[in-house]
Curated annotation (Swiss-Prot):
One of its GO terms (biological process) is symbiont-mediated suppression of host signal transduction pathway via antagonism of host cell surface receptor. This is Immunoglobulin G-binding protein A. Immunoglobulin-binding region C repeats lie at residues 270-327. Keywords: Cell wall, IgG-binding protein, Peptidoglycan-anchor, Repeat, Secreted, Signal, Virulence.
Amino acid sequence: MKKKNIYSIRKLGVGIASVTLGTLLISGGVTPAANAAQHDEAQQNAFYQVLNMPNLNADQRNGFIQSLKDDPSQSANVLGEAQKLNDSQAPKADAQQNNFNKDQQSAFYEILNMPNLNEAQRNGFIQSLKDDPSQSTNVLGEAKKLNESQAPKADNNFNKEQQNAFYEILNMPNLNEEQRNGFIQSLKDDPSQSANLLSEAKKLNESQAPKADNKFNKEQQNAFYEILHLPNLNEEQRNGFIQSLKDDPSQSANLLAEAKKLNDAQAPKADNKFNKEQQNAFYEILHLPNLTEEQRNGFIQSLKDDPSVSKEILAEAKKLNDAQAPKEEDNNKPGKEDNNKPGKEDNNKPGKEDNNKPGKEDNNKPGKEDGNKPGKEDNKKPGKEDGNKPGKEDNKKPGKEDGNKPGKEDGNKPGKEDGNGVHVVKPGDTVNDIAKANGTTADKIAADNKLADKNMIKPGQELVVDKKQPANHADANKAQALPETGEENPFIGTTVFGGLSLALGAALLAGRRREL
């Protein structure tokens, strides 16, 4: 078995050796042809790479291609040399920006600003810069030559004389636009005629100057000023009159008269003017403490828009002011639960059981059976002139205008009098309210206090008030009726007292009789 395997291996080895020998013989027979094919392939590859090397110039590229043609067997060496030269000529990284080096950037800028190149020429040079930045200096030199060759001749340049003529013509006030543009165009067409054109323009300007009687004289200036300050003209009307004044100053007086007539015709009607009622509403709304600025401005604008509804606007403003009043409990604010507000259960309120109220059974009330009661034989009986006598004007008399008077608000409300006849104005007070509360007139208060306008008062202001006695004492007599019992004073009180006295006397007599 082993012999058989050895024999097989030997046969395999002989076969391999034979194949190898045959291959070598065949290869040796075709070597020149294979080498030629390899050279052609290397040459083609070198051609392609050299053509696409961006940093070779045309001469260098053509030289390498010629070398490849002359000796294809040296293609690898030629390609290596070309690559080395291409790399050495590559722009440095710190000088690049999209492969545009410093020379290229400078050339770009200069070519873009050459005034005598047309667009096609300028674009052509720029494209050349992009294609081969290494030729920037050469491209720029060529562009400069072309620019200079196309420059206008010296006799067509805008010289100093022409520039001066331009400036003067532009500032001639009496030329119209058409005339001015005509002279400027002539200067552009033939700068050599600048002096003549300027002289001609000056003559025309002077001939068109306004005559002395058409200049802006004093009458025109006055009309200008007055028309500018006519309050009832709109902008279009005002501008129209002013333009007419400019066009023909000799008509200044007529134009001013016409403007005044139109201004008067457009004046607000009398019923729309700020009347006295409106002024009063203005003042009060400005002093309502609980309104915001936006609310106050809104009410004032409404007053301006329609003064005829001043009362309604004021009432609405007051209602809003009261609704926005702070909720803190104090003694001076209307609408709060305090000791001075009418309609509340406190010691000073009318209609409550207190020591100062008329019609109440207390020590100072008429009709009360006490030391101050009418009908009692003492120093405080009715008819005696003392501080507690019914009908006397004191601080506790029914019907007296004081801080505890029925139907009046407390000492911090309008209408309160003090002992000196001075009223301190509170927020929301008006002269009419104060006069009504004190039994006098608004005109009287205005005269006594020397008020220029009786509606112009402010909180904290002290007003002298001329107090008057009530015309009748009906209130005092009414107060003598006791609403709870129906008894009247002093007659009923006297009768009761007399009856008690008679009963006491009868009892004493009966006692003595029994003793006897």
